[in-house]
UniProtKB/Swiss-Prot annotation:
Annotated organism of origin: Dictyostelium discoideum
Entry keyword set: ATP-binding, Membrane, Nucleotide-binding, Repeat, Transmembrane, Transmembrane helix, Transport
Membrane spanning stretches: 479-499, 516-536, 564-584, 589-609, 614-634, 734-754, 1144-1164, 1175-1195, 1217-1237, 1256-1276, 1283-1303, 1413-1433
Gene3D superfamilies assigned to the protein according to its UniProt record, in alphabetical order: P-loop containing nucleotide triphosphate hydrolases
UniProt protein name: ABC transporter G family member 14
ABC transmembrane type-2 domain mapped to chain residues: 475-700, 1141-1366
Keyword Nucleus: no
Residues bound to ATP: 841-848
Highest taxon of source: Eukaryota
Database matches in InterPro entries: AAA+_ATPase, ABC2_TM, ABC_trans_N, ABC_transporter-like_ATP-bd, ABCG_dom, ABCG_PDR_1, ABCG_PDR_2, P-loop_NTPase
Any single GO CC term annotated in Swiss-Prot or TrEMBL for this entry: membrane
Region (Disordered): 1-21
Gene Ontology terms: biological process: aggregation involved in sorocarp development; sorocarp morphogenesis
Example GO molecular function: ATP hydrolysis activity
Lineage of source species: Eukaryota, Amoebozoa, Evosea, Eumycetozoa, Dictyostelia
């Protein structure tokens, strides 16, 4: 064994490690739990080794007890090398690195005035000479990391830690410029771009598909990263299973393998478990260089240490180069690393061995407090409020980042590191590790993959894996899938009933065209929903792209593969019902062509709308573009505007229109060879003309047909009326599929080369003129002075009136498949003024769940037990008077930081407090949170990369609660994701709140010793939601530690962190174990009995000490409903103003559609065909209104999520939000409607037949109709739980709107069932009646020669009047006049005499115009009531 030990030490030295730097780490002890898994691996190794040399794989024949995780990795690496593999030893060397970013004033918050100022600035000479503002994110940084080494990067927010990691990971696209020399094992950074998968960056936020399980998430990643050079006899499946089980065991998520991941809106893994999944997924990539950015966020201290040890072992054994940035690192984690790089304001102020860093800064004159961790000390020296200067060094220590950098570059350690870096680079030059690296990368590639590919697996393998994952995503949403196909079935029956069993006469001729076009439109509307799906999962795609898991184009191919079976089913369900109920030709071949064409059209439309999504940065831009295209495609399909009526400036569009080719193909399929008759409708008609002798003198009212032809073929109608060429059916079907392929290729290219995500990089934008100077020395001094002043004045501004809050026998049960699960088990405790209680436990112990229960945030499950405030039952105002800092940072992105804080203060502080005082307190909180310089910065979103960072969002979350001056404060991991200094400020601030009289409880994962000392009491939970300890912490934690020492735990040393000590003692962490059943021990302890007695005493004390309120009953909300409504409206109006994509998008859409429709129906005349064109003009305007529904739904759904968060904290009620989000749209709707009106009304020539009253009426009813459409979309969105469900439901509802409007099917032709109620309940019907009668009532029809139906008459009648007198006595519309045909006397019939005749055939009257306006307004009001109702019903989120 001694020989083995010596060999082990020798291996460590070869790797370049000095284990003496961290003697307290016991790898053997930390890896006991891997024994069972290791035994399995050992057996596999022995079986393989039996064929070769068994002793070489077992590291000298260690016993089973010695075979730990380290040995597993060592054996795996050894086996790999002996089978011809190569080592990937890729260190990183950086010299004189300067990274330049955009200055804070380079861009300002965009709003509706931005386009105007941009246009004005374009003509200013200064615009062309002004230089873009920039600043140095990193300045002249020189550092390196050898293969197998670990470097810890420390720094406060804004120091440049994340930027350094991104540059090392070769992700530099977000920066203005990157100067300096970066080499990877001797390979320049430019050349290393081809090995993207070998240097990865893992950002601090977690990006996953929330509906996938842990198993599905990791199995997919493994399928994409399964190497080609596996061990002999090792299949792809066995490799994946081995690595999957290993990683789940390493990070303690074995039991969560089949749990969905979840996110802030979907229940799933806890925050800590989700973080472990992020780490695990990154490790699957098997990169040579890994950069971890705050990867311990959300992990408890024990789990964070386990994670650090795991990457230590992998770095040692697999020669991984590891660079990590931790905001809060304990000494245990710190000592795992080899070197540390300390940054401040973009400058390197120390780089060298971890063991020398503390001494270096102490030599500069700084002192370290007892029990303060080294990482906290290293970052704290840069903060004037935290650093301690030794006596005798006053005025001699560095003050600014430039001073620290100068001191560093004058030090001996700096010169030593430069020398070591030079020697390392010389070693690289001699050994040329890149040769083995390049060969290994080639060998890892799949045999079916290109050798120079950046990806491990082939394109086909990627597509197969993505296809399976996409199927899982679809099938995991069973409710959405069910509702989609239910909607398809309902729509099929609705369409079929309207066009049921169409006759083979001339009336059936026209309705067949409408039915076929409706079938094409139906599939298009369903496809629109796919566009919004392209915006979901963009961050996941960006992450996977950076990991080189798959080509983005492979994702689209997989989506297309997924589309095919679901589209086939969708079209089959529709076709099997619609085709035969329509009464189309009962022919199997024709049914197949009908369905096959619809499938192609649906796939092509899906690809087209996805293309808009991929090309556009905003969903609203994409939706507006798609709406314009739908109007264009519908107008030029060949049905609403026949080809002879198309003007040359737009007629070209029919050649690139999917609808045109699909419509022509299905029309040809149905009409070719089919015979129609016009026996009943031939002119003249009536009993007097029924004899066979009159057949030769009657004519079908169909252009181009010969007199006497009462039967005709469908080809004749297609040729003469529609101008569709014969024999083009097959060609048109092929073209439809060609368009599909074309858009698929476009989408592949768009996904490969267009990336609208930021890759985790956030760029701040400020109000105009409010941007601070970046990394400026003077600005730095001013900021330090502000924080110092705020700290000194804290006590003067904090006045709290807290109470005693108790809870007893709290149990929380949720339903799970197969039964129920108890998450909290008889928890009891209290918080009272002046005390600060810590809530601790391992990840998944139930800390967040307990806070949710105590704060009355739970809406699901069963809560049992008693909670009392001041000895009394909780009242209706409890949520308002308590602050709850949640783990997830949910903020409205359209506000600035200061606006968000002021909004909270205005609505949650008592109404008696003046606005001036509220705003003054907001400024104080901004200063204390070190966010004064961010006050005018836009919050933004991480997806777009515009806004504040993850860490700044956490501080804002805390600030939003603090400005409300709550009486009780619950904080769920308030320091998670914050740096040590920010954490210290937060805890110190909270301590001040407690000292001022606020009771509070705070969950905390990784408290340093300094932070932990601020707490008075602790509630420690074990997994299963059971109490381990509740009581005082005591001076220097003696009371707490003595409890555990009394039950057999080793004593806690003076230098040890008590928080880490108790987590270790209770078996927390990934693989933590304890021989003591701590929950049972607590039940038997005398402390529990004391707790029970004190609880009873506190209830009585609270009831006596705190009088019943004298200001009347408790108020749920602080402010009146009117005040809430005013403030909510102002906020929403500001958000709309700052979203030009949304507001101007609707304006541009209205302008384009107005111009397209206006120029399509250019300068309409008085002929009968022009009157039909007037009807279709109005129908297109109606479709524009309907398409606006798609635009407004995402806005309400997204804003509702922010409302739920605000409502939970009782900012405002449901009514102010519901009414405000409707009213805020109205002015923008008026502008949109007016733009459309001006672009189309005069262009189409409608002014020639309209007086001023008719013109005003047209504008007014159109705007009112837009009010209805927008509010209808909002009402539907309010009903739906998510965007997918909304996009599934809305096509079904739109069918009723346009199908029963009286245009697609005349009212007399609508089936009695629908005509009896749906027709009369359809707002579009009243819109069409009002606007059609308004336009046509003054139109006198004078048929053109082409529109006249001319026919001869028997000579015995002498004159046309004699022949048609009987016909005219029947009261037909239109007029008859004498004419000449081929030199013979004839009659010419014009189908309409005036517009009134047309709309009277529909049962409409111009007397109902203003009545119809009133009815539409009633529908608008009804929609508002529906929005209010469903906002009320869904006001509480599911949690």
């Amino acid at each position: 064994m001694e020989e083995n030990s010596n060999k082990f030490e020798q291996e460590l030295k070869e790797i370049g490690q000095d284990r003496n730097q961290f003697p307290h780490i016991s790898v053997e002890e930390s890896l006991q739990e891997f024994d069972s898994f290791s035994n399995k691996i050992e057996n596999e190794s022995k079986q393989f080794g039996a064929q070769k040399d068994p002793e070489s794989y077992m590291a000298g024949g260690e016993t089973e007890e010695d075979f730990k995780l380290r040995k597993y990795f060592e054996n795996s690496e050894r086996m790999h090398l002996e089978n011809g593999g190569n080592e990937k030893k890729m260190g990183v060397s950086i010299r004189n690195l300067t990274v330049v970013g955009l200055g804070a004033d380079a861009s300002v918050i965009a709003d509706m005035s931005t386009p105007f100022f941009s246009i004005l600035n374009f003509f200013k000479p200064s615009f062309w000479t002004k230089k873009t503002s920039t600043f140095d994110i990193l300045h002249d940084v020189t550092t390196f990391c050898k293969d197998g080494e670990m470097v810890l990067v420390l720094g406060r927010p804004g120091a440049g830690c994340s930027t350094l990691l991104r540059v090392i990971a070769n992700q530099t696209a977000s920066y203005v410029s990157v100067k300096g020399d970066v080499r990877y094992g001797g390979i320049p950074s430019k050349e290393f771009e081809r090995y993207r998968a070998e240097s990865i960056y893992t950002p601090e936020e977690d990006s996953h598909h929330p509906t996938l399980t842990v198993r599905e998430t990791l199995d997919f990643a493994l399928k994409c990263k399964t190497p080609g050079n596996r061990l002999p006899d090792e299949t792809k499946r066995s490799f994946r299973e081995k690595v999957f089980n290993l990683l789940l065991s390493m990070f303690g998520i074995v039991h969560q393998a089949d749990t969905i991941v979840g996110n802030e809106y979907v229940r799933g893994l806890s925050g800590g478990e989700r973080k472990r999944l992020t780490i695990t997924e990154a490790m699957v990539s098997s990169a040579s260089i890994t950069c971890w950015d705050c990867s311990t966020r959300g992990l408890d201290a024990a789990s964070a240490f386990d994670y650090a040890k795991s990457i230590r072992i992998m770095s040692d054994t697999l020669h991984k180069t590891t660079i990590a940035s931790f905001y809060q690192a304990s000494d245990s984690i710190y000592n795992v690393f080899d070197k540390v790089c300390v940054l401040e304001k973009g400058r390197c102020i120390y780089f060298g061995p971890v063991g020398m860093a503390k001494q270096y800064f102490m030599s500069l004159g700084f002192d370290c407090e007892p029990r303060k961790s080294t990482p906290d000390f290293l970052t704290g020296v840069t903060n004037p409020q935290e650093r301690i200067i030794k006596k005798g060094f006053e005025g001699r220590t560095p003050e600014t980042s430039a001073d620290f950098e100068a001191a560093w570059k004058n030090s001996d350690i700096y010169r030593d590191q430069l020398q070591e870096q030079k020697e390392y680079e010389e070693l690289i030059e001699r050994t040329q590790p890149k040769v083995a690296f390049v060969q290994e990368v080639k060998d890892e590639n799949s045999k079916t993959n290109f050798k120079k590919s950046q990806y491990t697996t082939s394109f086909i393998t990627q597509v197969v894996a993505l296809t399976k994952r996409n199927f899982q995503l679809i099938l995991n949403d069973k409710f959405g899938l069910f509702t989609k196909y239910l909607s398809v079935l309902i729509q099929a029956f609705v369409y079929s009933s309207v066009f049921y069993n169409m006759a083979s006469d001339i009336n059936g001729l026209f309705t067949r065209g409408g039915a076929i076009l409706s079938a094409v439109i139906f599939n298009a509307f369903l496809s629109v929903g796919e566009m919004s799906m392209t915006f979901i999962g963009r961050r996941v795609l960006q992450k996977h792209k950076s990991y080189a898991l798959y080509r983005p184009s492979a994702l689209h191919i997989a989506q297309v593969v997924n589309d095919i079976p679901f589209t086939l089913l969708q079209v089959f369900l529709f076709s099997i019902i619609a085709y035969f109920m329509f009464g189309l030709e009962y022919d199997g071949g024709k049914f197949f062509i009908f369905s096959f064409t619809l499938v192609g059209a649906s796939l092509a439309c899906t690809a087209l709308f996805r293309c808009f999504g991929y090309l556009c940065p905003s969903m609203y831009i994409a939706q507006n573009i798609s709406n314009v295209f739908i109007i264009f495609m519908l107008t030029y399909s060949g049905y609403t505007v026949p080809i002879p009526k198309m003007h040359p400036w737009f007629s070209w569009f029919r050649h690139i229109n999917i609808f045109t080719y699909a419509f022509k193909a299905i029309m040809a399929n149905e009409f070719e060879g089919k015979e129609f008759n016009c026996l009943e409708s031939a002119i003249p008609y009536g009993p007097a003309y029924q004899g066979s002798e009159f057949d030769a003198y009657r004519i079908c009212p169909l252009g181009g047909i010969e007199q006497g032809s009462l039967y005709f073929k469908g080809e004749f109608y297609m040729d003469k009326t529609l101008r569709f060429k014969e024999g083009e059916m097959s060609q048109n079907v092929i073209i439809v599929y060609c368009w599909w392929i074309f858009f698929v290729i476009c989408n592949m290219l768009a996904m490969e080369y267009i990336d609208h995500t930021s890759g985790g990089y956030t760029h701040k934008v400020y109000k105009k003129g409010k941007a601070p100077k970046m990394n400026d020395v003077e600005e730095e001094k001013q900021q330090n002075a502000i924080v110092a002043n705020a700290t000194n004045n804290m006590k003067d501004t904090l006045h709290m009136d807290g109470g005693i809050f108790t809870w007893q026998n709290i149990r929380y049960t949720v339903k799970v498949p197969g039964g129920e699960r108890l998450l909290l088990n008889n928890i009891e405790g209290w918080i009272k003024p002046g005390q600060m209680t810590a809530l601790m436990g391992s990840s998944g112990a139930g800390k967040t769940t307990l806070l949710d229960v105590l704060a009355k945030r739970k809406t699901l499950g069963v809560v049992e037990g008693d909670s009392h405030l001041n000895g009394r039952e909780l009242e209706i105002d409890f949520e308002r008077i308590t602050g709850y800092v949640e783990q997830m940072d949910v903020h409205n992105p359209g506000l600035t930081v200061r606006e968000a804080l002021r909004f909270s203060a205005k609505l949650r502080q008592e109404p008696e407090v003046s606005l001036e005082e509220k705003f003054k307190y907001v400024e104080h909180v901004l200063e204390m949170m070190e966010m004064k310089h961010l006050g005018d910065a836009l919050i933004g979103t991480l997806e777009t990369g515009v806004g504040i960072s993850v860490e700044e969002r956490k501080r804002l979350t805390i600030g939003v609660e603090l400005v409300a001056k709550p009486q009780i404060l619950f904080l769920d991991e308030p320091t998670s994701g914050l740096d040590a200094q920010s954490s210290y400020n937060i805890i110190k601030f909270i301590r001040k709140l407690a000292d001022a009289g606020m009771p509070l409880v705070c969950t905390i994962h990784q408290p340093s010793s300094v932070l932990f000392e601020h707490f008075d009491r602790i509630l420690l939970l074990a997994k299963g939601g059971k109490t381990v300890y509740f009581g005082d912490i005591g001076e220097k934690s003696k009371t707490l530690t003595s409890y555990f020492e009394r039950h057999g735990v080793r004593p806690c040393t003076e230098s040890e962190n008590p928080a880490e000590y108790i987590l270790e003692a209770t078996g927390a962490g990934v693989h933590g174990k304890s021989d003591v059943n701590w929950p049972e021990t607590w039940k038997q302890s005398p402390e529990l009995a004391d707790i029970s007695r004190e609880l009873a005493a506190l209830k009585e004390q609270g009831a006596q000490q705190y009088k019943i309120r004298s200001d009347g009953p408790a108020r749920e909300f602080s402010q009146s409903t009117w005040y809430q409504t005013k403030e909510v409206y102002k906020r929403l109006n500001l958000i709309w103003w700052r979203d030009p994509y949304y507001t101007y998008g609707s304006f541009v859409q209205s302008a384009l559609c107005g111009l397209i429709i206006g120029f399509t129906f250019w300068n309409l005349q008085g002929s009968s065909s022009d009157m039909n064109q007037r009807i279709f003009f109005i129908f297109e305007a109606l479709m524009l209104g309907i398409l606006l529904i798609f635009v407004v739904m995402p806005q309400l759904i997204s804003q509702r999520e922010y409302f739920k968060r605000d409502f939970a904290s009782k900012f405002y009620s449901w009514f102010p939000f519901a009414i405000s989000i409707v009213v805020v749209e109205l002015p923008f709707i008026v502008i949109s409607g007016t733009i459309f009106f001006f672009c189309s009304f005069w262009t189409a020539g409608l002014d020639k037949t309209s007086d001023s009253e008719q013109t005003f009426y047209f504008w007014f009813i159109f705007v009112i109709f837009l009010f209805f459409c927008v509010s209808f979309g909002q009402a539907v969105a309010a009903v739906c739980i998510n965007m997918f469900f909304a996009m599934t439901l809305i096509p079904l509802l739109i069918v009723f709107l346009f199908l029963f409007s009286g245009v697609m099917t005349p009212p007399s032709s609508i089936p009695t069932f629908w005509r009896g109620w749906v027709y009369h309940l359809n707002p579009c019907r009243y819109f069409m009646e009002g606007i059609v009668t308004n336009i046509l009532k003054t139109v006198d029809v004078k048929c053109s020669y082409e529109d006249m139906i001319t026919f001869t008459f028997p000579k015995s009648y002498n004159t046309c009047q004699n022949y048609t007198s009987a016909f005219q006595s029947y009261g037909p519309s239109g007029y008859v006049e004498s004419s000449i045909l081929n030199g013979e006397p004839a009659c010419s019939y014009c189908i309409y005499k005036n517009g009134e005749q047309y709309y009277k055939t529909l049962g409409w009257s111009d007397d109902n115009r203003w009545r119809n306006v009133g009815i539409i307004i009633c529908f608008f009001v009804f929609n508002i009531l529906m929005v209010i109702l469903f906002v009320y019903l869904t006001r509480k989120g599911s949690r």
